[in-house]
């Protein structure tokens, strides 16, 4: 029995799929107009030259870093229709010939994942807080204390994280239509404002971006760290390609690009007419219609919640990939949808993320301070994605695409260097957060390798020879016993100890091996009953994003077990790194809990290992 699932390619995606992509992918980019120009012009004087130059830079940033890098280059790389950092790693590693290159890009992939996690802590905080601060534009609420706004933002964030366990399958159907209304609102309000100052349309000309740097010098370079806020969330275009499809995302981006850019144009036009504003989006909307401002504010808060939800779902997906590819230890995963393969919930991650977001809100307190800390991890992730693209196109000898990727990556690195200046203004936070999963991955993977070497698994031929002899002479226990191993070629020490040292051999002994494939989705299994008398092998192969029900597969294979054995390690060490590794192993759920094996049938076999 086998099944393989890949995203379908459509020449003309349906309107439903495009609307769904608009809701699930572009929340972060779609809410960036709330704060990008407001923060930039706290940093720069709002002169006509700076306003024209800033809008010009925003246009070319969206065009180069989002349109070219992700919708044009990155999306053509995956042959299976999947996206994300680990997918790029899976594409590149088989193409590399030197082990040193494999090690470097594996480390880069780990760094990229860690930076995305660091970025995703700040995203919900800045999105929700910046929207809530719009309350001050309502007459009578101009002097509301910031503490109350922070409290409201924390309540919204807490409600969002409390809601995760229930799953978002039902409400996610409304995300697309709501975000389409949001984008239409951005476009219409921006277009009306542009009509009063049509000269702002000239900002598309890159000469204004060049003049911006000439006039501002080094200050102009550091301004890129604020300009890049318009492109936050670009990685989601590529990462979400697997379950939404390339074409719906590309078509949706055409609509979103126009809507978002017109909002920037409208805000810039409003700034040309009113240079003393604090937040051009809020004040522009209020000036257009005071009556509609409160509905707009409510819509904006909902849009930021949807954007935050997409980020949280993305984190669950990244962590799940890292678990199945053995980069992170096993964490209990709940499946919140019977239909959508990507709808998962990881309780530990959810509450750690919730605590981190609330701490960020309490530490920074103002959206402009959060903006000053935001962007370093974003540009770092983009630079890593660009490096992978260059290497893949080079290995495939697609030199034209490689050249384009090289130019784009140089732009990414330029933005990254500009955001380094944010480290002293709070940018260190995303690095500190990213350092936590990065350190855990390095320690865990190194520990697993050391553990594997110390455990000294038994080879296939030696195991079969000893098993045949033992099965003939030993007294058989009634029923069927299950054992878990990576493969029959390397049989874990706990199996040989159980069968040969402790002489525990059942009438039927089934060794189950789980093989994680390089492809994201699809699974197959094969049950070989004829290895030796009383010995069978169930091999299960599945993609690193595929969700499997292990006990259901065992039942489908016709196996009715009496006992399930699995290996446990007692690590003895004086090395501080291995002590941390041992603590990680103890704190994380066991193999039994992860795969939801029936606890009353399970027996753990402890092996003492010195590292």
From Swiss-Prot:
InterPro entries tied to this protein: K+_transporter, K_trans_C, K_trans_N, Kup
Transmembrane segments: 24-44, 55-75, 102-122, 143-163, 175-195, 218-238, 252-272, 275-295, 296-316, 344-364, 374-394, 400-420, 423-443
Subcellular location field: Cell membrane
GO CC term (a single one): plasma membrane
Main localization (coarse): membrane
Record's function text: Transport of potassium into the cell. Likely operates as a K(+):H(+) symporter.
Protein name: Probable potassium transport system protein Kup
Organism of provenance: Methanospirillum hungatei JF-1 (strain ATCC 27890 / DSM 864 / NBRC 100397 / JF-1)
Gene assigned in the entry: kup
